[in-house]
Structure formats: C-alpha cells, structure tokens
Amino acid sequence: MHPAWFHIENEAEIPSPALLFYRSRIEHNLKLMIEIAGGDPKRLRPHVKTHKCAEIIAWQVQLGITSFKASTIAEAEMCAASGATDVLLAMPCVGPNAHRLAELALKFPQTAFSSIADAEDSIRFLASAAQQHRVTLGVYLEIDCGMARTGKLFAMQHYDIDILFISSFGCFRLSIR
C-alpha cells in the first residue's frame, strides 16, 4: 500500500464540506501538462468543467496557459475573470446564451470568446447576438467525423459553402485548422 500523499495537519479545525487544494500536487500536474504539450503552454486548452475553480485557472494563467474550454456561460465568465485571453464555449450557443456570450465579450474585451456551431441555426443565433452587441465572436464548426454523436456531417463539396455562410455575417473570427 502506498503512503498517503495528502495529510491534513489540522483536520479537526476544517469545516466540512470544504474544498482543499494540495498545491504542490496541482502545480506538478500543471507543469507535467505543459511538458506533455512539448513545453509550449499555448498548445493547451484545458476544460474547466472538471474543477470549476478560479484559483486553478489563475495558476494555469501564471504558467502561460491562457486558452480554456468551458461548458457553461458561468464557467466562461470565471475563466475571463481569472485572466484567460481565449475561451471556447464547448456547446452551440443559442437563445439567451448567445446574448450572454456576446455580453461577456463586452465585459471582458481582453478575452476572445468563441462557441462551437453544428448547424446554420446556431450560427444565426450567435451572429444575431454578436451583431446586436457589436462584438466579434469566434466560431468553431463542429464536424461529425463519422461517430454520429454531434456535429455537422462533413462533406468536402460543401466546405466552401459553410465558410462563405459563416463569413457572410461579418461578426465572426474564423480560423481553419
């Protein structure tokens, strides 16, 4: 059996439940992430849904990790408030959430916000919100690569049509990777 790597000295004084950080272990893991990414923190976009913690995001930013993926508008806001310069909302942004994302772009102009899109309707919702709030948002076209889980079924013959459709709104940052 392995010895305990996390020992609390004053256990009786800590209210329960409580969120406890083992800082040296977290910092070790963050540095290992960067090492696995070839030493370049700009190659990373960690998902915050697993910890939902501003302090951990701030530690990542201090190490040069500035791009993040979020599952909710609240997580996206937490990332921006913690120093993120690039936040991807990992879901199509429709209805009120499209406006909330555009409002975040106004509130945090130093942060580039993006959302995924898998259908023309989600692109229209996002475009409408971006235009109404006079901001530029990023859009990632989610592609169904054959698993039939999420995304738009990719057909090379329609690729240029998708790009033209997205760019026609004039309010998106569009990058092809």
Where are these regions (language model features)?
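Active-site-proximal beta-alpha core segment in soluble small-molecule metabolic enzymes
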Residues: 47-177
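Short, surface-exposed alpha-helical recognition segments that flank or form part
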Residues: 21-24, 114
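Short amphipathic alpha-helical surface micro-motifs
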Residues: 1-3, 27, 97, 122-123
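Generic structural "secondary-structure junction" signal
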Residues: 16, 21-22, 50, 149
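Generic N-terminal amphipathic, Lys/Arg-enriched alpha-helix
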Residues: 2-21
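N-terminal glycine-rich anion-binding loops that anchor highly charged ligand groups
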Residues: 2-6, 25-56
